Amino acid sequence: MSFFALGVNHQTASVELREQVAFNAERLKDLLAQQRNHAHLNDMVVVSTCNRTEVYAMTEHADILLNWLAQTNGIDIKQLLHHVYRYEDAQAVTHLMRVASGLDSLMLGEPQILGQVKSALALSKESHTVSRDLNRIFEYAFYAAKRVRSETAVGSHAVSMGYAVAQLALQVFSNPEKLTVMMVAAGEMNTLVAKHLAEMGVAKVIICNRSRERAESLAQEIAHQVEVEIIGFDQLAANLHRADVVSSCTGSLHQVIFYQDVKAALKKRRYNQMLLVDLAVPRDIDSKVETLDGVYLYGVDDLQSVIDENLAQRRQAAVEAEVMVSQLASQLLTHQKIQQAGSTIQMYREFSQQQSQDEIARALTDLNKGHDAEDVLKQFAHRLTQKMMHPTSILLREAAQHESPDYFEWMKEQLTDVFEHQRKPKNNLDR
């Protein structure tokens, strides 16, 4: 039984193909329930996000993973063949750890993927398609991800506009829980900014947008995390003083936040500082506001330079993280081999005990029949030795024929050491 990882991601497949093989949680739960009694594919976890769909499974038949992925999505296998990647055992473990740590993500070091992998495991557990061995691999991958994030800087620098704005707010204001944020426009960029700020724990988000419908759509996305208020675009200047942080991205050809408006807002705020972030091109905010005391103005170029520098730092940290993942994967595989050896040793011990019991019973029967005790004892020892040596002798001969010479020489040395140790005379002084 081997551990396999098979799938497609943003590096190997177009968005169109990724859409074809994607699963939502409800459909995936039904499919996993169907796999529960499958002879060769009943121990599996499926990770499906916008950037990847991957199947992780314990199985003896790797091709069945590709067949399953194609058939469940109605895709010709030939269409998938040129885009899927497949890893086995050590490589599969390393890949899973890299995925969980954010090292294989489109946005290097992004933290969301760990939660998505955890959710995938939880769904498979609910469907009873996760063995103890498969669960152990995933739990160790989560441990690796935690180590990577806590011991390297791979996730500590902002590399998206939304995240950068949130981090900037933390630098300017020490306590995000007291902040009121104003989103001027409710487009895609400001939606990302609003989500990051809401997750950071700001007190309130004011959405200022021309279309109330679009503002309400954004409000619904963050209302479970933060208090939300919607105002019309004509109310922007009158409410500017209420905002500690303003993020503007309108797409307008003209400025929408003027010097005099910000100056008046500062006065109403008793000159408490304001952070203004202009994500628009052309710019939304009059650049002269930067001359006002207490105003921090950042534009797209300012943020992009920070993001570029941070991404370079993440890439540097990723080198250290890759080494850590490789070491942790090796530790897990070593642990698994030791466990497998322990199971084999236990089986061999039980086999030996059974052979001993059989021969003892036979010897006692012979003694009860009046056979010579010395002959019975010699026959007992001979038969037991033959039974114990037969399977190991066969394995040693096969190893000599098929295993690498180095491995066979190592095994001979180990056995020789054991035999020499057993031949040493006992110290009778301790009796």
From Swiss-Prot:
SUPFAM superfamilies on file: Glutamyl tRNA-reductase catalytic, N-terminal domain, Glutamyl tRNA-reductase dimerization domain, NAD(P)-binding Rossmann-fold domains
Binding site for substrate: 49-52, 105, 110-112, 116
Binding locations of NADP(+): 185-190
Keyword terms: NADP, Oxidoreductase, Porphyrin biosynthesis
Transmembrane regions listed in the UniProt entry: none
Catalytic activity from the UniProt record: (S)-4-amino-5-oxopentanoate + tRNA(Glu) + NADP(+) = L-glutamyl-tRNA(Glu) + NADPH + H(+)
One example of a Gene Ontology biological process annotation: protoporphyrinogen IX biosynthetic process from glutamate
Record GO terms (molecular function): glutamyl-tRNA reductase activity; NADP binding
Residues the record marks as site: Important for activity: 95
Assembly and interaction partners: Homodimer.
Family, per entry: Belongs to the glutamyl-tRNA reductase family.
Name of protein: Glutamyl-tRNA reductase
Organism of this sequence: Acinetobacter baylyi (strain ATCC 33305 / BD413 / ADP1)
